[in-house]
Amino acid sequence: MNSAKVNPSGHAPTPAPTASQGAAFPANRYALFFGLAIAGGALDLWSKEAIFRWRGLPGTQDVYWIIEGYFGIETAVNIGAVFGLGAGQGLVFAAISVFAAAAIIAWLFFFKAARSCWLTFALGCITGGIIGNLYDRLGFWWKPGLPDQWQSGVRDWILWQASDQWKWPNFNIADSLLVTGAIMLLVQSFFFPPPPHGEADGNELPGRRAPDEPTEGTKPAAS
């Protein structure tokens, strides 16, 4: 039987909060985050293995154009960070990736940031990208006979260019997940205010009023 708090003013009693209302965040946030992270990382690793098996190592075949002159498939090994930045620091970026993944999990589930569905989705994408690239940075794909500098390099295969003079560095699905998550975080910071403490936002739009919340100027029903 549900208990209710008696309002001294004589207005309708306020129902006691249920267990789900008192929870820090919905339990399905675990499934959302870890599902995205694992699926994203697995898709990235599968795609890299399949493309490199099909197209070979960098420099062995010409570009396979999907949209001639603009978008295609070309294998490459990136020994830097995202889009080739920081070349030669693969192990440093691997250490940063491990720290970032641990910090994300702590932020979501220990500091309760998982109250936000949007934020959970964004960080799930980022973690999936971290997993995909971390596997390569730790050298799990590398085999004896390959160049030593590739041992902490990341396999890339997506080619996009606006023209022959303007070519974007090759990237992969993990990079795409990282960028998608980063864009979502920017959108979150500009358009989605954080939910009140202890309240999960679910799929609520910013500023949306809860169904039982009285509007300004209305009075509660008398008992």
From Swiss-Prot:
The keyword Secreted does not apply. Pfam families: Peptidase_A8. It is found in: Cell inner membrane. Signal peptide: none annotated. It catalyses: Release of signal peptides from bacterial membrane prolipoproteins. Hydrolyzes -Xaa-Yaa-Zaa-|-(S,diacylglyceryl)Cys-, in which Xaa is hydrophobic (preferably Leu), and Yaa (Ala or Ser) and Zaa (Gly or Ala) have small, neutral side chains. InterPro entries: Peptidase_A8 (IPR001872). The active site is at D156, D175. Keywords: Aspartyl protease, Cell inner membrane, Cell membrane, Hydrolase, Membrane, Protease, Transmembrane, Transmembrane helix. Its main location: membrane. GO terms for cellular component: plasma membrane. It is a multi-pass membrane protein. Pathway: Protein modification; lipoprotein biosynthesis (signal peptide cleavage). GO terms for molecular function: aspartic-type endopeptidase activity; endopeptidase activity. This protein specifically catalyzes the removal of signal peptides from prolipoproteins. PANTHER family: LIPOPROTEIN SIGNAL PEPTIDASE. Belongs to the peptidase A8 family. This is Lipoprotein signal peptidase. It comes from Rhodopirellula baltica (strain DSM 10527 / NCIMB 13988 / SH1). The gene is lspA.
